[in-house]
UniProtKB/Swiss-Prot annotation:
It comes from the Eukaryota. The modification Phosphoserine is found at S499, S575, S690, S1048, S1208. Residues 674-687, 1145-1160 have a biased composition (Low complexity). This is NHS-like protein 2. It comes from Mus musculus (Mouse). Residues 288-312, 526-545, 708-729, 897-908, 1131-1144 have a biased composition (Polar residues). Residues 162-181, 288-321, 336-364, 400-423, 474-591, 669-741, 854-938, 979-1003, 1033-1087, 1121-1197 are annotated as: Disordered. Residues 549-567 have a biased composition (Basic residues). InterPro entries: NHS-like. Keywords: Phosphoprotein. Transmembrane segments: none annotated. Belongs to the NHS family.
């Protein structure tokens, strides 16, 4: 359209004098009037231009019409027979003549309107006009029907499925015969309606429509694809509920033909004829969505023919029951291709990501998925629902996506609807159906009674067919509330309500079948869920590889169903997803809550290595979970539960009431919820990722090993089985070889449940992901440390993920991944806490442990710099594992003791200070012997050239610290190769968890003096080496405590280096004396802790007794009963001989280092702390401890609170003296 070009210049219109201020109202009015006039002038110009344009068009049209008319006249003359009557002909001829004569006459004079033929008469109607009329009629009918349907749906939720828009139902004699030919149900594709000549198919000409519907000719038209008409029809009908393609039986008895064509759905012609019989009998309606068919890319005609054939099969019984059976047969056997229409999968109503993820592979199956809705009253769904209003929402009691989301998991009894299904709005479901073109089997009447419903029993067969995805008719034979979808359907539902899966109380119906069909979906979903945010990427990544795994896992998953599990809010599915990327969304959904294993499923990744874990679970479910298929879903769903909400809250809601256990499980499943989804973004640490992948393949199949013990109860030590699992999985996860045996390190799991541990674990995980490569992680696998980190991370994920995880992750995350490597960040993050408080008790129990603390100290040292205050608590829980482990590792541990002795010699910290490297070397050598014992994993980790054994163990990171730090550092590091890495990680975690006031600082301080250069060298060996100095510092801290006595002076002396190294670790105030005593404690604790983790890794069995022992020991330590004993017992005293021994006896040394108050404070603080913890005084005992993580844990978890308080006080006293 030509745009008017304004040529008038405003200044010319209203020439202005020099602008003057508008002083008067009239001036303003004048200006306004002028502007208005200008605008009007513009408008007039535009209108004039438009008019001119129109005039030109009209003239051109007139000329064209004239020429066309003349041509038509000439043509007629040439035709042998006149199309028009004589009069018309004469008129036309005359007009043509006149046109020729007046060729220049205006177009209007000769406009085509003068044509004698009446276009609207049937006789003279051209095909184009015919089509237009038909379309108009269809639109009108669709509008009318929509109105009627709404009325019916609102007024008649009852049985009237059809809301007939027009006149009374007409007996359609012809349709009946045709229905006899075809099935009773006539599927009217949209294309057919459009294609049908009778525009009245929609019901404008009801009789004709009926005839056309039933007529064979019409059928042929129907079969023929009419792409354009179909599209048009879609457009017209979409507004209508008919679009849902579920054709409710016309109960009202109104013309079914019109309805059928309108709805493009199968309907019983007989029903239309005999509304009563159909209303009574036929409750099941099979609707095929034409749109779905189109979406599928199946030509409408094939779908139509398929539907027709199916219908014909069904046709045998006019009575509703027979019809139902026939339909069932159709759905199961035929599974109309249209049901598998892509449209269903494409339906965005479902979680789009899940669908997309498996659209390619699952596409047929999903589309096939037939949603079986049991409609109690009527097939009418809510108007808003995708189902046409005909399925008024109230009518559907069917389990919606939430139940479906599990797929077959939907409970037959409708439990799902209440728990999981209720989550999915009915509206969500309807979109599913139309898009899926799923045959919507609504068993409305007495689905259970209907023989068609037996199809449910048949359904498994269908499910088995599901691999063929096309027959996706998930007929829910149970019908009433049971919504069962074909595998694809289940998956789709699963997709639809990812959060629901945990909730569904459905018993797995044909779980194996469903799993087979859903495996692929499970993988994508799991991946999505594992992501925490449903990420299509994860799904895509995992789908291929994990699909097979998920298939077998899924089948196992069935046995895992945990009916009693309390469904957590949907959010947990997201969290869970993080852990097991492959399983979470789909897998979770796959297992309804009912189906979930009673015991939480730990990832079989872990479980694979720890077969005994089932005992930890106390559930045969664990073995089942071992099945690759079952585990993923089950643990994912439970993970979702746990992770979705507060750790403890999730625990309460989760099947295992055990808060600790639940937390453990969650973390075990994915140490850092990323374990399960290594490929997904969830995997935070490369090592975890690789291990997780492996675990996913191996262990994931079963429910996570110790994840959730059905016996819940943070307090209940029986929970230890879960801890065992988490430790085994966590620790064993990384070291598959050694961890494989340790199925159930009970205590570690327990510890991981403790908030302190979890923060550290978290940190470890984060570090692994950030700083360390996957390879390092593999190295870690060899050592128990990696495992410890993982379990801790898992634990921390729930308990202190936010609080400790962030801080620790920042501090320790680089360290943790490569336990051997100690980076400066590690050193900073590592906080030497008086682990010995808690751990010395363990040590007291066995000299090994005490010695181990030396090793642990080394490990802790790298981590001591981490400030998370809560780190120590988990060590307590883990200590029993370390005890268990220690005896086996005594040779290694004793070398540690030797190193501890070396550390004791180190107690001549003065020389150590003077010759830090020399001392370090000496200590390193002692560790070297001990290291060989424990150096198996360590050697694989050999990174730094410093200590041959110890260095190897610590892969240079520890070694450099050992060399650079005091011998104690290498000793400790070298000592616990398993424990080394593991305990280092744990120490780091502890350090992070433990409040800043930790004796570790002195060691760090001392370390810097000794090994700034060595440290640098070590750092050269590995990124972690900077931390290794801190690790060494731990030992050093013991040494400095002793030799340095630097309590504060040591701090002061070491302060420069300490500030450099320990700055990272924490403030110099952490300081020598706390470093010595607390370090010994922490070292002990860490060593024990690590040993425990190692033990978990190596020694599968941890019992509640161990856990209790650890707890009691920690209590004793807190009370100070065994503080000295622990210190005496060895590794601490040996390692920190002056400080530790004096401060274990040590207290003296601790006092010496930080002043008598250090040791005394530790003992007294421990007693006070323990008492306070018992009285909840100690929960905030350590202000220096990070309240955010530790205190949160305290508040959240009584046990964690106690442990945190213990550690806090332990460190606080030391801290205060040091400070």
């Amino acid at each position: 359209m030509p745009f008017y070009r304004r040529t008038v210049v405003p200044q010319r219109l209203c020439p202005r004098n020099p602008p003057q201020p508008l002083a008067e109202l009239r001036d303003v009015s004048h200006l306004a009037a002028l502007s208005l006039l200008r605008q009007l002038a513009d408008l007039c110009g535009h209108s004039l231009a438009l008019l001119e344009d129109l005039e030109g068009h009209l003239l051109a049209l007139g000329r064209r019409t004239d020429s066309l008319y003349r041509r038509t006249v000439r043509l007629r003359r040439r035709l042998p027979c006149r199309l028009l009557g004589p009069e018309d002909d004469e008129e036309l001829l005359a007009a043509a003549n006149s046109g020729r004569e007046n060729a220049t006459a205006t177009a209007h004079s000769r406009s085509s309107w003068r044509q004698p033929v009446n276009v609207f008469l049937s006789s003279g109607r051209p095909p184009s006009v015919e089509e237009l009329l038909r379309e108009a009629q269809l639109n009108l009918q669709s509008l009318l029907q929509e109105e009627y349907e709404e009325q019916y749906s609102e007024a008649r939720l009852l049985g009237q499925t059809f809301r007939s828009s027009d006149g009374a139902p007409e007996p359609t004699p012809s349709p009946r015969p045709q229905s006899a030919k075809r099935l009773e149900f006539v599927l009217m594709p949209a294309k057919r309606q459009l294609s049908e000549d009778e525009t009245t198919t929609q019901g404008v000409r009801a009789p004709e429509a009926c005839l056309s519907l039933s007529t064979a000719n019409k059928q042929s038209a129907w079969n023929d694809p009419f792409p354009l008409p179909i599209l048009k029809e879609r457009l017209w009908l979409q507004p209508c509920s008919t679009q849902s393609d579920l054709v409710p039986i016309n109960i009202s008895g109104q013309q079914f033909d019109r309805h059928a064509s309108f709805r493009h759905s199968l309907f019983n012609t007989e029903t239309a004829v005999n509304p009563k019989s159909t209303l009574r009998r036929r409750r099941t309606i099979i609707g095929f969505s034409n749109f779905s068919q189109r979406d599928q890319g199946h030509s409408s005609s094939p779908t139509g023919s398929l539907a027709r054939s199916a219908t014909s099969d069904i046709r045998p019984g006019h009575s509703a029951p027979q019809v139902v059976q026939g339909r069932v047969a159709v759905g199961q056997e035929a599974r109309f291709p249209s049901l598998t229409s892509p449209g269903l999968r494409h339906s965005s109503s479902e979680p789009g990501d899940a669908h997309q993820a498996r659209s390619a592979s699952d596409h047929p199956g999903m589309e096939s998925m037939a949603v079986v809705y049991s409609v109690p009253s009527s097939c009418n769904g809510p108007t808003e629902s995708t189902f046409s209003t005909s399925w008024k929402g109230d009518a559907f009691t069917y389990m919606t996506p939430s139940a479906s989301s599990q797929g077959n998991q939907v409970s037959e009894n409708g439990k799902n609807p209440s728990s999981g299904n209720s989550w999915v709005p009915l509206n969500t479901l309807p979109p599913l159906v139309p898009k899926e073109a799923a045959t919507l089997f609504v068993t409305r009447d007495n689905p259970a009674g209907c023989t068609g419903l037996p199809s449910y029993s048949e359904h498994p067969t269908l499910r088995r067919q599901i691999p063929e995805r096309p027959p996706k008719i998930g007929l829910l034979a149970r019908g009433t509330s049971r919504l069962e979808t074909g595998p694809g359907g289940t998956n789709r539902f699963r997709e639809r309500s990812l959060s629901v899966p945990t909730d569904s109380g459905v018993t797995s119906v044909d779980y194996d079948e469903e799993q087979k069909t859903s495996e692929t979906r499970i993988l994508p979903y799991a991946s999505t869920s594992s992501e925490g945010s449903n990420s299509t990427d994860n799904i895509a990544a995992l789908s291929t590889e994990q699909e097979a795994r998920h298939r077998r896992q899924r089948s196992k998953s069935i046995s895992l169903k945990k009916a009693k599990k309390k469904p957590s809010p949907p959010m947990r599915s997201v969290s869970l997803v993080k852990d097991e990327p492959a399983l979470p969304p789909e897998g979770e959904l796959v297992l309804p809550k009912d189906q979930r294993p009673r015991s939480l499923c730990l990832s079989l990744e872990h479980q694979g290595h720890h077969p005994p874990h089932p005992d930890a679970q106390g559930h045969p479910a664990v073995p089942m979970l071992k099945d690759p298929g079952s585990t993923q879903f089950s643990h994912h769903w439970y993970l979702t539960d746990w992770k979705s909400g507060d750790t403890y809250q999730s625990l309460s809601s989760s099947s295992t009431a055990t808060g600790t256990t639940v937390i453990e499980c969650t973390q075990v499943q994915g140490s850092s919820e990323s374990l399960a989804s290594p490929s997904t973004s969830r995997a935070t640490t490369p090592s975890q990722l690789s291990i997780e992948v492996e675990a996913r393949e191996v262990a994931s199949p079963g429910r996570p090993t110790g994840l959730m013990s059905p016996s819940s109860g943070y307090s209940s030590q029986s929970e230890t089985p879960t801890p065992t699992v988490s430790m085994s999985l966590t620790l064993g996860h990384l070291p598959p070889p050694s961890a494989s045996v340790r199925v159930r390190p009970v205590v570690p799991e327990r510890k991981s449940s403790l908030p302190p541990t979890s923060p550290m674990e978290k940190i470890c995980k984060s570090r692994l992901s950030f700083d360390l490569p996957l390879t390092s992680s593999t190295t870690l696998d060899l050592s128990g440390m990696s495992i410890s980190i993982r379990s801790k991370t898992k634990v921390s994920r729930h308990h202190s993920d936010t609080n400790f995880g962030v801080k620790l992750a920042q501090k320790t995350s680089p360290n943790q991944p490569i336990m051997p490597m100690v980076t400066q960040s590690d050193l900073r993050s590592v906080r030497l806490r008086s682990v010995s408080k808690s751990e010395p008790e363990d040590d007291i129990e066995s000299p090994d442990y005490i010695e181990e603390p030396g090793a642990e100290e080394v490990f802790t040292m790298p981590e001591r710099k981490v400030k998370p205050p809560i780190a120590e608590k988990p060590p307590l829980a883990r200590r029993p594992p370390s005890l268990v482990h220690r005896p086996p590792s005594l040779p290694g541990e004793y070398p540690l003791t030797s190193p501890t002795m070396a550390m004791a010699s180190r107690s001549s910290i003065p020389h150590m200070k003077q010759l830090p490297q020399d001392s370090y070397t000496v200590l390193r050598k002692p560790k070297s012997p001990s290291f060989p014992g424990e150096s198996t994993a360590s050697s694989s980790l050999v990174l730094s050239p410093l200590a041959s054994s110890s260095g190897a163990f610590f892969s240079g990171t520890q070694q450099p610290p050992q060399a650079s730090v005091e011998d104690g550092g290498p000793k400790v590091r070298a000592l616990p190769e398993r424990i080394g890495l593991q305990s280092q990680e744990e120490a780091e975690k502890k350090m992070t968890k433990i409040p800043p006031p930790v004796p570790k600082k002195p060691s760090v301080l001392y370390l810097p003096l000794t090994s700034p250069v060595a440290q640098m060298d070590a750092c050269m060996a590995e990124p972690r080496l900077p931390f290794s100095p801190i690790i060494t510092l731990e030992e050093d801290g013991k040494c400095p405590s002793t030799g340095d006595d630097q309590k504060s002076p040591g701090k002061g002396v070491t302060s420069p280096l300490h500030t450099d190294t320990e700055k990272e670790a924490i403030s110099p105030g952490r300081s020598v004396e706390p470093s010595a005593e607390e370090k010994s404690l922490i070292s002990d604790k860490t060593a024990e802790w690590i040993a425990e983790e190692e033990d978990d890794v190596f020694v599968a069995s941890r019992t509640t007794e161990d856990l209790f022992t650890v707890i009691h020991r920690s209590k004793r330590k807190l009370l100070g009963w065994k503080e000295t004993g622990e210190g005496f017992t060895g590794s601490k005293p040996s390692s920190h001989s002056p400080v530790k021994n004096t401060a274990d006896s040590p207290t003296g040394e601790a006092a010496a280092a930080p002043g008598p108050s250090s040791s005394a404070c530790l003992d007294a603080g421990r007693n006070d702390d323990f008492k306070a913890l018992l009285q909840k005084k100690g929960s905030k005992a350590t202000p220096r401890t990070r309240p955010s993580a530790a205190e949160l844990l305290k508040t959240t978890n009584p046990l964690a609170r106690r442990i945190i308080a213990q550690f806090s006080k332990d460190y606080e006293p030391t801290d205060n003296p040091s400070t």
